[in-house]
Amino acid sequence: MWPGLVGKGDEEGQEPPISLERMLDLTAAAEVDGQKYDGIDYFLFLPHTNPEASDDELKGIADLIQGKGFDIGSLVAPVWPGTVGDSAMGTEEQRGKFLEAVKMACRIAKVFNEHGARKRGVIRIDSAEFGVEKWREDTAANTGTIVSTFKEAAKIAADHGERLAAEGEICWAGMHSWKDMLDVLEGVGMPEALGFQADLAHTYLYTLGYNAPEHALVQEGYSEEEFWPAYEKMTDALRPWTIDFHVAQNDGEVHGAGSHDKTGKHCPADDPNG
């Protein structure tokens, strides 16, 4: 249900959010050569979900989703500042908010699981520290803080029978390059509880070293012959940790509405590069 919320808002150039029911109807109507969607991913925050909703309210949401013909799959924890959470690289208070967001996500997952609407899927997180400037002030210490926060989050998830997936995007500190992402995953060292979610556009940008030129595997103007071995090196490194996959909405060059580095957020459906 992400496209109904990401990049949406009341700022200049933004469209208003699309309601949950409308998103479900649009998804149910999507069909190509007889292929339809059988499930959805789901962001655990307003306006689609109040993360503090009662069990009965959550069961009502699950009924609505199942009534449209869908299972609930991966959940997106509200880890960012302005939602429930805050930076995984921040102060003790900020990190506490991050962990509280993971706890809330696990609680909602349990309700959906017991209801029967959710049978599989991960809980998606990232470092919730936008941009790499602050991270660069002390890379080792800041990565260490993220690792520590993610370890605690992974323990919470494991205690609830859940698995976290850190989505590698070039805008999130400590996760902004394939090598730095690998450092975090290996630093946590809990593959049964924390893995990697590959985003198709951002793994492409990982290969270019967009926010980490020192980790670039190809340069702009690359040939096909140069690109594929480089891409394979990146995928070989991250494959053992990869537990979820995000089909990108563009080719890594489109800038949609919103603030994500390079790719913006979700681009219009009729964009030729979409």
Where on the chain are the PLM-derived regions?
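N-terminal pre-domain/capping segments
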Residues: M1-K119, A141, K151, A158, ...
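Receiver (REC) domain switch-region micro-motif
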Residues: I40, I123, F245
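Active-site groove signature of glycoside hydrolases
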Residues: A109-T139, H160-C171
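Acidic/histidine-rich catalytic cores of soluble enzymes
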Residues: A141-T143, V147-P268
